[in-house]
């Protein structure tokens, strides 16, 4: 992505709207795939204008090596030389000869001492917690600090900041040696940049005695120990403007925003696929994805969400079976699915657009020059402005957080339908997988946890940026709160990962229960058919389609826990069918028919429990001969990931294993990025367009 344009382009697009629009071409999914590709590259080349969210997230995680473009050296040196020459000319420039902020009326000719004092007074953060067991809770997480170092170097490489190239090389060396200065978690309003946290990077570079860092193995190092380990020869004596160049920028807020958006983009794609999986396992009607509906609404996010769901559902074995079931009994479920399923593209579409727009906004920010003053060597002047105002970060993060909360709300609505036997089209209550529902409450605890997660997520959706307080003696009277909003959004991402984990395990549980349902129903059909033939060997029961129709229409989990009970729904409905047929017979044959009904029920009462137990045992041992339909679906890679790669299985009350143990496995894998490949595999055949309606 290019941000500094040649003159011809600048003249044709002076407001940069065309460049911004160009960046939105293509699908969101392709953009996310590119983001992941950037993340997985082994090297990040910094030149000042082409840094991506994926690269920032990668460096944050400690992955690639960072290299500086030699082409940037000349511009960086020119701005640094200009500062020194301006001092010699007695040019009055903010932060070089003046005090800072509301104290800019003050003057000094001791430029180096001024920078040293700047770093000293900005080292105002608090690391202490008063709790020895939690001694890092007031420290910015290491990944965010690494990302901030990268972004600050990228900004300074553009040659408008008056800093030596050697300082940028030193920061890069520290990054590549996995040495990370400790920064305070709080204390910045991201206006005049992230002054307080960035001052600790500057303090580390000049060897301040209070500076500490985390080494490659997690050990705490002093600045001296770290420099020796990295092979950096000595601390820096800051020249005029260099301290200000290091601290006066939005790097910390945009760093955390970048890592947040990397995860958020993946989670929104997951929510699209998960909604399609929900439709599959709920025996939903796929017409909600029909392209005409979404084409007429015009919103690109909605159209893409529907197209992705349509792709997952196209050819799905569950969808084919559901169509068959709907034909057998059109009144078994509502004509239209509920909103959490039917309007999921309309719900997710705006969230996709918001997160995509936020991603572009932050990507522009991390490639921007955002300090003050800016050194314009070509015009031989310093320009005093306010690019340090991190409003794009605060606004983008507030919007992202609201989108994440909406995604979580949809996920919760789908989850609560899935575990409720009044809504889930025949699955057991709480998705209980055991033999005795009175001793197996399945995901009941998980539903409570999901309510908790969702409530917290909705609370976090409240905006941060409207809580501005005036600072620096009313010099910073409006400020972005960019890092605070980024931190809050990072919390929201964690909670949405918890929800995604719980929901994905629940979907896999539901798919397995559909499989068990199919095996059990087949076995019950065979028992009822055999018994009807052997016991009801009189007219009108030689053709027993009506009897099997009852079996096919009745939800198997409504009776399978106690199949021998004469009061279970299956037995009652079979009895009604037989009574109706018996009463329709000539008067002389009625008594014989009624005697057959009793024998029929007695035989079922004897055979069904044995057959149900045999099927359950075979299912548990994996010796059944009915394939799981999920293997014939495009959503299978996610199921395989949870069941095979992470070694989870159907949860039952008979197993000592708790749901939380499986949730831990899945959450850890999601946090490690292992969800990405199976997620993309679900969509590997999608051509980026809806199925044609012509």
UniProtKB/Swiss-Prot annotation:
Residues annotated with 2,3-didehydroalanine (Ser) modification:
192
| pH-related activity note | Optimum pH is 8.7-8.9.
**InterPro entries in the record:** Aromatic_Lyase, Fumarase/histidase_N, L-Aspartase-like, Phe/His_NH3-lyase_AS, Phe_NH3-lyase, Phe_NH3-lyase_shielding_dom_sf
Please tell me where this protein is predominantly located.
cytoplasm
A GO cellular component term found in this entry reads: cytoplasm
What EC number(s) would the UniProt record show?
Answer: 4.3.1.24
Query: How does it get modified post-translation?
Result: Contains an active site 4-methylidene-imidazol-5-one (MIO), which is formed autocatalytically by cyclization and dehydration of residues Ala-Ser-Gly.
Please, one GO biological process term? L-phenylalanine catabolic process
Q: Does the keyword Cytoplasm apply?
A: yes
Keywords (A to Z) from UniProt? Cytoplasm, Lyase, Phenylalanine catabolism, Phenylpropanoid metabolism
Q: How is the activity affected by temperature?
A: Optimum temperature is 31 degrees Celsius.
Location in or out of the cell: Cytoplasm
Q: Which pathway does the protein contribute to?
A: Phenylpropanoid metabolism; trans-cinnamate biosynthesis; trans-cinnamate from L-phenylalanine: step 1/1
Q: Does the keyword Acyltransferase apply?
A: no
List the active site. 94 (proton donor/acceptor)
In which family does this protein belong, per the annotation? Belongs to the PAL/histidase family.
Q: How does it assemble?
A: Homotetramer.
What biological function has been recorded for the protein in this entry? This is a key enzyme of plant metabolism catalyzing the first reaction in the biosynthesis from L-phenylalanine of a wide variety of natural products based on the phenylpropane skeleton.
Q: This chain belongs to which protein, by name? A: Phenylalanine ammonia-lyase 3
Q: Which organism is it from?
A: Arabidopsis thaliana (Mouse-ear cress)
